[in-house]
């Protein structure tokens, strides 16, 4: 019945998803002419469309045995393995495609995608660049290259390539979304928000974009918009555990502990074996000063996912504050084994050494921490502290000044500078920093007292208004604004009016 029908008609049936009819057409052709490679290709595609992947693999293999130089078939063959999660076989197939056509951009891109999934970022970068070299309009390869740079924290490079992808394919909402992620990661929060809003203007129901927009608003401490978008994302897809974790994180930042735990409980009803849920539960306990409870949660996370460095690091932090130094060091060393280039790990290893009065080890670890994360004021303070202990006064001055440049309100840094200048004989400067230290210390006592009361009474708007006023009186408007936003979210008209006045003053 079908031998007279053409290969073209078979492919038209595939386009209309009439896979069983297409299988009959191509089978009839192949039975008459088993060397018809186009019919074999169509038959494999039809079997794949019908959901019979093993049969599709068998047909592709038969076709390649007849002519191994079919680079398009090697790519299609590789795609089947990639979709099954067999990255090694997929990569082998894509390499065969490139062997027969070194300019095959899909083969180059797909091989790079597999390598990216395998975290072989350097080789993946090479193949993405080759794909772009042979097709300067290949926006998919540009987006993938940008994603590699995002994963490597090379945000400026990521933005460059994602902008190029946007120019190559201005209609791609996916490219615009990735560009927004890159801007947020590069701390261009407002630019990231703009990209996300452009995507949602076209497709307002996308849960992932709403979630990431909510996170971006949270980074700007716009709590109402953050909660609105994250909650909308959950409404669209309530099974996404990261959305529940983000919601919990926002609530905890607002001292809404019950709501924070409730969000995580919803996540646990979906899957109790996700380590990140227990880490977030631990964070809530830690932020409230309950280190034993925090440690239990972090240890659970480490049991569930022992390969996750963050679980061990968090356990180490809790153990450090519980003064269980040997156990803390063991946890940090395990984290270091899993994530060797992380400033926070070396920072706490240095603090463990400081607590043991092992100044040499402390200095070495803190120097490594500062090298990996030179924008962390606490690292520079602790480095200055150990240099003070070993009477390296000039080095201590330099370290403490770097800490001060990052955070001029750090009371410990101010006190340290006062002591250093006293030792260096610069008494005027010493008195200046010590006087400033007393001011900040008193301010911190007052804010800490209010924060404790807010955690106990999270719906008390008056307490938040008093806290915001404390920051305003110190001209620390950037810290007053998020607290006023919290109060406004809870329904304070006074906070809304204050916010409006402050934002009008600081708006460029």
PLM regions and their residue ranges:
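Structural signature of tandem alpha-helical TPR/SEL1-like repeats
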Residues: 15-24, 49-62, 83-96, 117-130, ...
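Long, contiguous interaction/recruitment modules in multidomain scaffold/adaptor proteins
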Residues: 1, 143, 178, 212, ...
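Alpha-helical segment of the N-proximal tetratricopeptide repeat
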Residues: 5-28, 32, 42-49, 79, ...
């Amino acid at each position: 019945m079908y031998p007279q029908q053409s290969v073209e008609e078979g492919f038209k049936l595939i386009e209309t998803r009439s896979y069983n009819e297409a299988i009959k057409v191509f089978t009839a052709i192949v039975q008459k002419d088993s060397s018809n490679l186009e019919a074999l290709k169509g038959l494999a595609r039809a079997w794949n469309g019908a959901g019979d992947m093993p049969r599709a693999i068998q047909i592709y293999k038969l076709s390649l045995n007849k002519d191994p130089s079919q680079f398009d078939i090697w790519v299609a063959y590789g795609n089947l393995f990639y979709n099954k999660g067999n990255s090694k076989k997929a990569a082998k197939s894509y390499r065969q495609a490139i062997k027969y056509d070194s300019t095959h951009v899909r083969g180059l891109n797909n091989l790079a995608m597999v390598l990216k999934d395998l975290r072989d970022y350097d080789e993946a970068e090479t193949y993405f660049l080759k794909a772009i070299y042979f097709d300067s309009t290949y926006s998919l390869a540009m987006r993938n290259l940008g994603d590699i740079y995002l994963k490597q924290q090379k945000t400026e490079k990521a933005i460059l390539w994602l902008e190029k992808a946007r120019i190559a394919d201005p209609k791609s909402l996916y490219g615009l979304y990735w560009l927004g992620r890159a801007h947020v990661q590069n701390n261009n929060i407002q630019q990231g928000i703009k990209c996300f809003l452009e995507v949602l203007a076209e497709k307002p129901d996308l849960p992932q974009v709403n979630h990431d927009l909510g996170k971006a608003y949270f980074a700007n401490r716009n709590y109402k918009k953050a909660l609105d978008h994250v909650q909308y994302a959950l409404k669209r897809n309530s099974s996404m555990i990261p959305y529940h974790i983000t919601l919990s994180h926002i609530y905890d930042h607002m001292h809404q502990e019950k709501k924070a735990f409730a969000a995580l409980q919803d996540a646990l009803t979906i899957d109790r074996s996700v380590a990140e849920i227990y880490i977030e539960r631990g964070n809530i306990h830690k932020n409230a000063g309950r280190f034993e409870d925090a440690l239990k949660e972090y240890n659970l996370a480490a049991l569930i996912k022992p390969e996750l460095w963050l679980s061990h690091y968090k356990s180490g932090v809790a153990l450090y504050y519980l003064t269980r130094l040997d156990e803390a060091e063991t946890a940090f060393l395990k984290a270091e084994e899993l994530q060797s280039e992380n400033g926070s790990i070396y920072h706490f290893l240095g603090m463990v050494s400081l607590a043991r009065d092992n100044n040499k080890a402390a200095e070495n670890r803190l120097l490594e921490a500062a090298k990996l994360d030179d924008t962390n004021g606490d690292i520079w303070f602790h480095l200055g502290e150990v240099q003070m202990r070993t009477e390296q006064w000039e080095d201590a001055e330099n370290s403490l000044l770097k800490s001060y440049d990052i955070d001029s309100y750090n009371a410990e840094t101010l006190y340290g500078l006062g002591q250093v200048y006293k030792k260096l004989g610069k008494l005027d400067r010493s008195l200046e920093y010590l006087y400033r230290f007393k001011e900040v210390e008193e301010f911190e006592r007052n804010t800490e007292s209010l924060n404790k009361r807010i955690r106990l009474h999270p719906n008390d708007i008056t307490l938040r208004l008093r806290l915001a006023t404390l920051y305003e009186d110190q001209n620390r408007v950037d810290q007053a604004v998020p607290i006023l936003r919290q109060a406004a979210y809870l329904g304070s008209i006074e906070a809304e009016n204050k916010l409006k006045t402050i934002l009008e003053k600081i708006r460029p």
